[in-house]
Amino acid sequence: MLTYDLIVIGFGKAGKTLAGKLASAGKKVALVERSKAMYGGTCINIGCIPTKTLLVAAEKDLSFEEVIATKNTITGRLNGKNYATVAGTGVDIFDAEAHFLSNKVIEIQAGDEKKELTAETIVINTGAVSNVLPIPGLATSKNVFDSTGIQNLDKLPEKLGILGGGNIGLEFAGLYNKLGSKVTVLDALDTFLPRAEPSIAALAKQYMEEDGIELLQNIRTTEIKNDGDQVLLVTENETYHFDALLYSTGRKPNVEPLQLENTDIELTERGAIKVDKHCQTNVPGVFAVGDVNGGLQFTYISLDDFRVVYSYLVGDGSYTLEDRLNVPNTMFITPALSQVGLTESQAADLKLPYAVKEIPVAAMPRGHVNGDLRGAFKAVVNTETKEILGASIFSEGSQEIINIITVAMDNKIPYTYFTKQIFTHPTLAENLNDLFAI
């Protein structure tokens, strides 16, 4: 049996960072990753980076094959860089499957070779996998893809169906629409973007439909099957025909390969690994970080989980999940939609003293310079404490602007401060002067 100070299962953001840090400090560290294609984790290889690379490449006058090749070049480069960075710190990297034999012993297997590893500290960083709904034919029909498979098609589908109207589905809808596919999004919910401000969601729906994307709500899928190479999506009322189908019906924590039944590690009702404020499971010394612990599925949350565990293992444990404040998010549709904090309806439900303001991008000089007048800014503020309660930024570059607002919220900077903040001109960010003049 091989003994380590730290074993990390999974090459994701939190795990790889922790492994490198502790190895650099002289600890004996092992990192186990079952797929060489996943060095660096989901974001680098099959998530944020390749999908945003595809979006940028789609804006250029490239063929479908060139767009895919561009994505593969960038992800391959970053994959190799991540491996080299971690290996360079002295971490023992095992390309193998890993599962638990007991609370502190894991077995790894590569082909026919098996090894047992043990450590007082084990970090589970296995991420999440696509949630396959129990729809007849979904898992067995050909030309049906998850969010990984849809990034690696050999040819552009003339007609693409997307099952699910969440962030992943809508981002791929915009991408493949730009590439030239006729895209139809079929969503089981009766409301488009239910977590967004209704006025912003209405604009997003309008723009996507103007761009040629068909958006269908309240769809009840009963079966998926093939007619030759075509995919037939059967609903209660109609049958839709596609050349390819993407199912984007959420992602769930990747716990099944771990064989946690051999341990005392507890799961939540939703199947995630249960953790405390230090990301530690109920088994002392065993931690779960990133998507597998049931938190928000963003790579920057995984990075913050690293900070929490590192504080516990190396520092005084003072930084915990309880210190995590406002978490911004961006959906990379066209234009990008970014949000942080509360919506107006949430503020009303909490019976807070609030005020709102919304201004269209069409009223912003930079929008005219960019030649793109689509979108709007909306803010929700507390009229008594002067705190910013939330904001929705729907415009080109919103993914950058939202971070300015998040910093202000985390540091309780009064919204009135923005009315006198000096911004460069012409920018979209300068319109925060007007947005917060409430």
Predicted regions and their residues:
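N-terminal Rossmann-like dinucleotide/flavin-binding domain of flavoprotein oxidoreductases
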Residues: 2, 42-116, 195-222, 344-346, ...
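Flexible, glycine-rich terminal cap/loop adjacent to redox cofactors
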Residues: 9-37, 42, 49, 53, ...
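Beta1/beta-strand and adjacent pyrophosphate-binding region of the FAD-binding site
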Residues: 1-12, 156-166
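FAD-site-proximal beta/loop scaffold in flavoenzymes
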Residues: 140-157, 239-316
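Rossmann-like dinucleotide-binding cores of NAD(P)H-dependent redox enzymes
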Residues: 40, 73-79, 151-152, 157-161, ...
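Beta1-alpha1 glycine-rich phosphate/pyrophosphate-binding loop at the start
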Residues: 4-6, 11-77, 175-195, 325, ...
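Glycine-rich dinucleotide-binding loop and its adjacent helix/turn
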Residues: 48, 126-182, 186, 214-215, ...
